[in-house]
Amino acid sequence: MPEEGSMLDRNGFAPEDFRFRGLHPGLSVGTASDRYAGWLGQIYSRDRYAGRIPSRQNKVGGRTFTERVLPIDSVREYFEHFEVLEIDFTFYRLLLDEDGNPTQNHHLLARYRELLGESDFLILKVPQVVFARKLQ
């Protein structure tokens, strides 16, 4: 819900509240990630996720950093602000393994599906093994 004193237009757009749903019928705004703890206080309510944000170590370009990731149910609050979400983790691993068994990505997408509303929209990034092959 927009904060008291927000300037809403007729579609409910409130940029000061980071609400970008309904800007225009031909425009959908979203991001390429959704569980970013840096958005606490803007997209996500701080109190809702207190004590529920684990940390994990990531390595990029030889440098290690700590990342905090919100729980997957935060996607419900994400879609209060945006209409579309690009899922980029599908780039790194297929949905099924070589034996046809569901991978972790498959199970994670199934969980996202349980949490989506009727007007929420996902875009899946094509796996690199399919699309980003190196030419020899």
Where are these regions (language model features)?
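Residues lining hydrophobic/aromatic ligand-binding pockets adjacent to catalytic sites
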Residues: 1-136
